[in-house]
Amino acid sequence: MLFDRTFHPDEANQAFTTGRLLETGSYTYQPQDHHGPTLYYAAAALQRSAGNASTAALDGTLLRCTPLVFAVIAIILGAAALKRITGRLTPGAILAALLGTVPMFAFFATDFIQETLLVCFLMMMFWAGAGYLRPGPKWKTGTWALMFGTASGLAFATKETCLLSFAAAAMAALPFLARRGAIDKIRERVCARDAIMVTGGFALTAVILYSDFGRNFQGVYNAFIAAPLSYLHRGVGDATTSTGANWHVHPWWWYASILFGGKSIYSLAAIALAALAAVCALMRGAGRATRFVFLYAFALFAIHSILPYKTPWCMLPVVSALALAAALGIADVMGRKRHLYILAALSAIIVCDTQLTACVQMGRNPDATDIPYNYAAASPEVKELAAIVASAMSSATNHEPLTTNHKPLTTNHAPPFIAVALPAADTWPFPWYNRQWEPNTGYWTSFDDLKRLAETGIKPTVVIVPMEEGHLVQPLFPHLKHTKRFYMRPRIPARNVRGVRVRVFW
């Protein structure tokens, strides 16, 4: 089951942010290496409904249910948009089958990250846009405009990369705007009130969420000014303002290799979906909506490919748009010649079957390193490491908790406690699996901190250090008799990934 896979370091970091929100009741937006608050607010509400009120009490499965709920809502909104465009329910059912079996969508729908929520709010924008463009009374167009603005505000309050989606949509609209008389039709259709509704809905939603419901307006400045600059640096791979941005710098063709050039069971599914979307969009008689969505997916793929900073989950809006274009295209041929209808149905069945096979394969071994979406993941061995730490801590006699983390200890803090001295990026997701003992854990980034700790005479119950510094621990803490080696990040020779290895002493 995908729910059973090891927490990704990013998931663990997001989980701790959710835990802090539960414990303090407030959220402070940080523009460097963090994203908007919608995921945290939604997850916190779900955790509270289950009676969980602290980081230690967080339920991992429930956390991963949060994006899954929004994945289902995204499919429903997409189907509703197709119903408004085509007037039929069948295209929505096709979208549900296509999108519900996309391997990448299935994988990241249970990942505690922002991308699934972003797709949901982008689908909400598409639904509201479809409602606005459909002829109707003026009061209804104002309502649709407000919904569109609110959805765009929610997308912006989810992840800053929504701006790339907005840019791609604008690029996709250019061929339609270039047609004779298109601008005049827009002037007749769009009124100042609707523009105010869109702008107001966007601004009000974004300000409310980024300001933590009016309690911290510094978050608004960070979201609109500081964050775009930070993520511009990150997008080009500049690590001076974004931790580890250079680790994710890849060549322009990297996304194509992830989607179409990996293990056949995954690449065939992606190729089949992309081919179906392309054929449907380019065939004679394709609707404007089909062509717009396909052009949007192509433009978004191109933008992400040009930017040096790349991670697989950034492709989720692209594959979602491909599924939408394919469903619209199949709807276009329905009602025409019977052989086209049969061909479209067979194409959809083949694509769904190929994708479903890939999803089943992922579910059998969700931690497999040959899954192309298992990127920068943690090793399953981190669970065994956490189990050893918990056992050592439970067997200790003194359970006095520390009063602070991440600071040098004093002799007033008695064992048991855990001393972790690892580079910050290599520490995660251990804090997630160690959350029960977080009050009794000190995190440092240098072995020199352990030397100063030893000089105070304090004897930690557990010490975790990088593999290459393991031989220095027992001379400092001779009372630690047991040791074992673990991979925090897996070694993947096929990708030239050396992995991250640590040693634990207890």
Label the model's feature ranges.
Residues 23-24, 42-69, 88:
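Juxtamembrane segments of multi-pass membrane glycosylation machinery
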Residues 382-399, 412-447, 461-467:
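Short periplasmic/luminal acceptor-recognition loop of GT-C membrane glycosyltransferases, typified by
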Residues 57, 78-101, 137-139:
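Transmembrane-helix signature of polytopic, membrane-embedded enzymes
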Residues 65-86, 124:
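Transmembrane-helix motifs of polytopic, lipid-linked glycan transferases
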Residues 77, 117-136, 148-152, 321-325:
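Specific aromatic-rich, kink-prone transmembrane helix
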Residues 13-24, 35, 41, 49-52, ...:
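Transmembrane-lumen/periplasm boundary regions of multi-pass, lipid-linked membrane glycan transferases
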Residues 8-9, 60, 104-117, 161, ...:
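Short acidic/glycine- and proline-prone juxtamembrane loop motifs at membrane-interface regions
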Residues 84-86, 125-145, 155, 174, ...:
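Membrane-interface transmembrane helices that cradle and orient dolichyl/undecaprenyl
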